[in-house]
Amino acid sequence: MLVVSSPFTRLLVCFLLSGLLLVPSPIRSEDATGLGQLRTISLSKLDSLLPPGTHVLIERSAIEAFLVALEGAPPDWATVYGQGHHDPGHDERLFNLNRDRDVAREGNPALNWHMAFIWPGELSQFDPDTKSYTVAVGPAFNVTGWGMVRFKPEEFPSNLRVRPNKKLAALISRSLAKREKAEVVVVMAGVLIPTESIIYDFSHEEEGVGLIMPVVRVEQVEVVLKPHAR
């Protein structure tokens, strides 16, 4: 039993306990060693890995339905863009769009959706000590009737690694030895951040194309080996 014998000690204990309460929840889908399991499940069966009620936002129709529920209608991209980045009013119009949309979505139930999205990835460096592979991940750009949609994790594990079973490990090793890619899909699930949940911008690759970035607080990461890599 803990005995607190002085005002200073009591203050210190309270401080330490409050610090523990403020530690953020870790991203799940890891074993006791901190390594994720390499999955071979079909993307159509992702529900089995995710919490009940998760909205899987992979298909264009699902992404557009999410945007309709949260934002109502697409912005008038042509008006916001004007004459482009060199237009004197371009930045102000884009700022106003983001500000007005932030206000309009306040209290919208879709802000509380638990959702999942995917980014493409590849397995690369093998660590013989942990028998795991590093996962290199890049963003995915989804073409929709609203513009380009890129889901953006608020934070992402800086050293994502997965451990395949023995059969998969042998297959992946042979593929990499032949300089073939071992492609994966990185599934991220979580909820939108409470403020500035959606960022509106323009594509840096295609002139005048609108870019929508939902910002997600990631709570779960799953790595799925692509079928042709099995």
Region annotations inferred by a language model:
Residues 2, 19-21, 209:
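Residue-level detector of alpha-helical hydrophobic segments embedded in or interacting with membranes
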Residues 11-22:
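Bacterial N-terminal signal peptides
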Residues 27-230:
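OB-fold and OB-like single-stranded nucleic-acid-recognition modules
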Residues 5-6, 18, 25:
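Serine residues within intrinsically disordered or low-complexity segments
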Residues 1-13:
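Bacterial N-terminal signal peptides that target proteins for export
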